[in-house]
Structure formats: structure tokens, C-alpha cells
Amino acid sequence: MKLHYVAVLTLAILMFLTWLPASLSCNKALCASDVSKCLIQELCQCRPGEGNCSCCKECMLCLEALWDECCDCVGMCNPRNYSDTPPTSKSTVEELHEPIPSLFRALTEGDTQLNWNIVSFPVAEELSHHENLVSFLETVNQPHHQNVSVPSNNVHAPYSSDKEHMCTVVYFDDCMSIHQCKISCESMGASKYRWFHNACCECIGPECIDYGSKTVKCMNCMF
């Protein structure tokens, strides 16, 4: 009976998130998984807009670092107009602690028939290519993961300008969660990953000095 209740509630949550208008709704790609978890645990059932904030603290603790991005999904804060700040303009980046450069190079050499897109460009372009993109650094040494803005004037490791170094990145064709993005990039030996908030995943190779390309290029996950 309990499993049936959970299944029905999860379906209702997904239908609710799908029904919300695209221009005035929560960031479904970023929030759906965590919002479902918190709602299933009945931690976000109160309505602050109606004067009832009895669950606000518990809901905030459940959403943790995603509170700012996802509080509107559970009716805890005012909805945002995402047509002004599309999910593709934000991303989360993280350095992977056990990269396997030889594996990454082997998987990205030549043409592949796998569900990803390999892109290479000069490291100089990587360092100079600053778009209107807000990046968040996923920190793993905190009790709870926290997202902090990555400064635009990062100090990068020096590289020789007399030889053109290339940065190679991989974009998966389909949308995926940030957890799946990290696992997928680790499994192919990547050094870092960038997860755009529209759910596009980019794995970053060992020759890249910064966090790869700041442009969304996932074939089936562009918006």
C-alpha cells in the first residue's frame, strides 16, 4: 500500500512539473529529482504565501544547495521568469579526483558511433572565451555540497604558446542529471565536467586548463 502511495505521489509530482509553463516555472531539469524526494518525504507541504511556514526550515534543509534554484518548484518562493535567465546560461563544474588521461584520449580519438559529440579547440580559445555564463563550483570537501560562483579571472596553469595545445571535450547527446553526468565523465577518464542547468553534460579532457567550453552543444538537449 505504501509503495502504491509513493508511486502515485511521484507520478503526480512529475505531471505537475510538466504542466508548469516553460517561461514561468521552476528549472525542471535541475530540480525534478530533489523536489520529488522532498515532496515524497512530505517536507515541503506548507504554504508560506498563505501564512503557513511550519515546514519551511525542513524543506530548505532537504533541498540544501538547490534551495535558491528550486524553492519555486515547491511553492516556497515566488516563481521566476526563466525566459530572462535560461538554464543554458548557468552551469555547475567540478574537478574529478581520479582522471585517467590515457582512457579519455583513447575514447575520443577518431570518429565514434556512440551517443556523444567530440569537440576540440585551442586552449588559448578556452581561456579567452568568456560568455555571459554563470558557473558554480561543486565542492566535495563540505558536509553538504555547496555551489559557489567561479570567478572570471581564475589563475590558470601556464602553458607554452609556441605549441598549439588543444582542449578536447565530449558532449553527450541526451539530457541527464548532474549525478549521471559526473558518473559518465568519471567512467571515460575525464578530468572535470560541466553540467549545464538545462541538463546538458560536458566531459572535459586532461589537456584543458579551464573548465572546457561554455557553450551548450548536446544534440538532443539544447534548451
From Swiss-Prot:
Compartments (UniProt record): Secreted
Signal peptide: 1-25
Record: glycosylation sites: N52, N81
GO cellular component: extracellular space
Record keyword Glycoprotein present: yes
Pfam family, one: Tsg
InterPro entries documented for this protein: Tsg
Predominant subcellular localization, coarse grouping: secreted
Record key words, sorted: Developmental protein, Glycoprotein, Secreted, Signal
GO biological process: regulation of BMP signaling pathway
Binding partners and assembly: Interacts with CHRD and BMP4. This interaction enhances CHRD/BMP4 complex formation. Interacts with BMP7.
Stated family: Belongs to the twisted gastrulation protein family.
Domain notes: The N-terminal domain is sufficient to interact with BMP4.
PANTHER family the record matches: TWISTED GASTRULATION PROTEIN HOMOLOG 1 (PTHR12312:SF17), TWISTED GASTRULATION PROTEIN HOMOLOG 1-A-RELATED (PTHR12312)
Role according to the record: May be involved in dorsoventral axis formation. Seems to antagonize BMP signaling by forming ternary complexes with CHRD and BMPs, thereby preventing BMPs from binding to their receptors. In addition to the anti-BMP function, also has pro-BMP activity, partly mediated by cleavage and degradation of CHRD, which releases BMPs from ternary complexes. May be an important modulator of BMP-regulated cartilage development and chondrocyte differentiation. May play a role in thymocyte development.
Entry protein name: Twisted gastrulation protein homolog 1
